[in-house]
Swiss-Prot record:
Active site location: 28, 162
Protein name (record): Pseudouridine-5'-phosphate glycosidase
Binding site for Mn(2+): 141
Phylogenetic classification of the source organism: Bacteria, Pseudomonadati, Pseudomonadota, Alphaproteobacteria, Rhodobacterales
Cofactor note: Binds 1 Mn(2+) ion per subunit.
Record text on subunit structure and interactions: Homotrimer.
Catalytic activity, EC: 4.2.1.70
Keyword entries, A-Z: Glycosidase, Hydrolase, Lyase, Manganese, Metal-binding
Naturally occurring in which organism (per UniProt): Dinoroseobacter shibae (strain DSM 16493 / NCIMB 14021 / DFL 12)
InterPro entries assigned to the protein according to its UniProt record, in alphabetical order: Indigdn_synthA-like, PsuG
Necessary cofactors: Mn(2+)
Top enzyme class: lyase
Gene: psuG
């Protein structure tokens, strides 16, 4: 491991894995702080970590707790983070602020990628990436996740972009950023709660070993930047597009009526969709995160073989 700043605390299990060149999978924490209510959030986080351990890798949930940048959380720390009422949601722009001000915060995809690369963690599992929001023509609301994927060398396993986004424009920005977008056993881009879409995916690979080999060639070419592995939600857990799209449209109309913008957009939409779907969206969300964690662990193991 490289020397890390004094405000960074690496969990013993993660430190040992990195020092012995064992597979590690990074996990973000906005899904804990902003994605679902307590105690669902902590139960989900523990279950996802167990999925990774069961596949032979070490989980490293990344977060900021009271100004300390945590790479890997113990059970007590996970519970403490899950109970924080006013946690920040941090990206590249404000991760330093949260640490310097002694705040607690959930890390977005972008912030988690930054910390993972700093620690030498190659693979990261999340639910869905951020992207271009609908109505971008007037709001210019584009997630920093997309530019981070273009600049930071981490493999991100996700169920595509969150379906609340303008997914075609999100795919265009990823292409502009030079991000390798790989469909795992799929020819269309997964749409988060739905396993497929009408958008063709640029690249397809059918095994963790193939993804690992692709990354090794990218390393040899010194390309830099990230890879997005789009992993469809399991068929038994998906919500049909015609159903989920109705919930999304209702939630977005309410959001516009209430003039909600900025970082409040995604948490508001996810909460309203949870309410409109009577909890079904949350159950699907948990299932797809677990599915992504399993694939991420398999890729991490393959990279170290």
């Amino acid at each position: 491991m490289t020397h890390l700043p004094s405000f960074v605390d690496v969990h013993a299990d993660v430190r040992n894995a990195l020092e012995t060149n064992a597979p590690v999978v990074a996990l973000e924490s906005t899904i804990i702080t902003h994605g679902m209510p307590f105690p669902d959030n902590v139960e989900m986080a523990k279950a996802v970590e167990e999925e990774i351990r069961a596949r032979g890798a070490i989980p490293a949930t990344i977060a900021v707790l009271d100004g300390v940048l945590k790479i890997g959380l113990g059970a007590d720390e996970l519970e403490a983070l899950a109970k924080v009422k006013d946690a920040l949601k941090i990206s590249r722009a404000d991760i330093g602020y949260a640490i310097s001000q002694g705040k607690s915060a959930g890390t977005t995809v972008a912030a988690t990628m930054i910390v993972a690369q700093m620690a030498g963690i190659r693979v990261f599992a999340t639910g869905g990436i951020g992207g271009v929001h609908k109505g971008v023509e007037t709001s210019f609301d584009i997630s920093a996740d997309l530019t981070e994927l273009g600049r930071t060398d981490v493999i991100v396993v996700a169920a595509g972009a969150k379906a609340i986004l303008d997914v075609p424009k999100t795919l265009e920005v990823l292409e502009t950023q030079g991000v390798s977008v790989v469909g795992y056993r799929t020819d269309t881009l997964p749409a988060f709660w739905t396993s497929g879409s009408d958008l063709d995916i640029p690249l397809r690979l059918d095994s963790a070993a193939e993804i690992s080999e692709f990354q090794k060639v990218r390393d040899a070419l010194r390309l830099g930047g990230g890879m997005l592995v789009a992993n469809p939600i399991p068929a038994g857990d998906e919500i049909p597009a015609e159903i989920i799209n109705g919930y999304i449209a209702t939630a977005q109309a309410e959001m516009a009526a209430q003039s909600i913008s900025g970082k409040a957009v995604t948490p508001f939409l996810l909460q309203r969709i949870f309410e409109l779907s009577e909890g079904r969206s949350l159950r699907s969300n948990i299932a797809l995160v677990k599915n992504n964690a399993r694939l991420a662990a398999d890729i991490a193991v393959a990279l170290h073989s």
